[in-house]
Amino acid sequence: MLREYKLVVVGGGGVGKSALTIQLIQSHFVDEYDPTIEDSYRKQCTIDDQQVLLDVLDTAGQEEYSAMREQYMRTGEGFLLVYSINSLNSFQELNSFYDQILRVKDSDNVPVLVVGNKCDLEMERQVSYEDGLALANSFNCPFLETSAKQRINVEEAFYGLVRNINQYNAKIAEAEKQQQQQQQQQNANQQGQDQYGQQKDNQQSQFNNQINNNNNTSAVNGGVSSDGIIDQNGNGGVSSGQANLPNQSQSQSQRQQQQQQQEPQQQSENQFSGQKQSSSKSKNGCCVIV
């Protein structure tokens, strides 16, 4: 399917808008002036090795058709701003036409091309080439001088506008691509931050669980009271109800061992005491049979 370009020809009355359009479409020059309200033309052509379809709208230049002209401007992709080199007034009108286009399109950058028509009327020139070029530069768009009568730069004007549209669309596409890449980068950065935050949360959760497990282990290894309740001190001992039981058993065993060690010593002391008493009685002349 052919790519279709909607081109709108804008300018004051009598500057040759219809003559340019008919010369492009029908390849002949219309000499008489017939004020146009609106005419639409279509032509298939080849631009930069591509088959395209040009839909050219020739608009009325009179001020009374300004509201109607705005409707055409809304549908246009690119605009030829046409003045006549032998009419200073038509040249000065282009500023208001350009402002109207920007207002209707709600943009400060629209594909346009400034055309100084009737360059064959050099002897009647009121607008210099330099002035036309300066105006185009202020609009940031290309500039051509044309002659519909002599078919000078007619195709170049319309084809140049198509190229301008393509460049404009390419810039828009590139800007959208960069914006999409920036959005993807922002999403990736946000996702990375979310993952980092999740990892920190997981690490904190693992740390808290480890602390809780250590506390539980310390409590289990602590003492148990007589009622089976874990000692809150967590010191590994038992409560006072049973804390002294091993110590008491140990003391009793030690006393038994000491008593057993003391019995032979006591017997030896008793024997020694008996011998002393026997010796004493023998000295006193008494004899005791034991």
Curated annotation (Swiss-Prot):
GO terms for biological process: cAMP-mediated signaling; cell adhesion involved in single-species biofilm formation; cell-abiotic substrate adhesion; cellular response to farnesol; cellular response to glucose stimulus; cellular response to heat; cellular response to oxidative stress; conjugation with cellular fusion. SUPFAM superfamilies: P-loop containing nucleoside triphosphate hydrolases. It is found in: Cell membrane. Transmembrane segments: none annotated. One of its GO terms (molecular function) is GDP binding. It comes from Candida albicans (strain SC5314 / ATCC MYA-2876) (Yeast). Keywords: Cell membrane, GTP-binding, Lipoprotein, Membrane, Methylation, Nucleotide-binding, Palmitate, Prenylation. NCBIfam families: small_GTP. The gene is RAS1. This is Ras-like protein 1. The modification Cysteine methyl ester is found at C287. GTP binds at residues 11-18, 58-62, 117-120. Required for the regulation of both a MAP kinase signaling pathway and a cAMP signaling pathway. The activation of these pathways contributes to the pathogenicity of the cells through the induction of the morphological transition from the yeast to the polarized filamentous form. The keyword Glycoprotein does not apply. Belongs to the small GTPase superfamily. Ras family. It is a lipid-anchor. A motif (Effector region) lies at residues 33-41. Residues 178-216, 246-283 have a biased composition (Low complexity). A lipid is attached at C286 (S-palmitoyl cysteine). InterPro entries: P-loop_NTPase (IPR027417), Small_GTP-bd (IPR005225), Small_GTPase (IPR001806), Small_GTPase_Ras-type (IPR020849). Disulfide bonds: none annotated. GO terms for cellular component: cell cortex of cell tip; cortical dynamic polarity patch; division septum; mating projection actin fusion focus; plasma membrane.
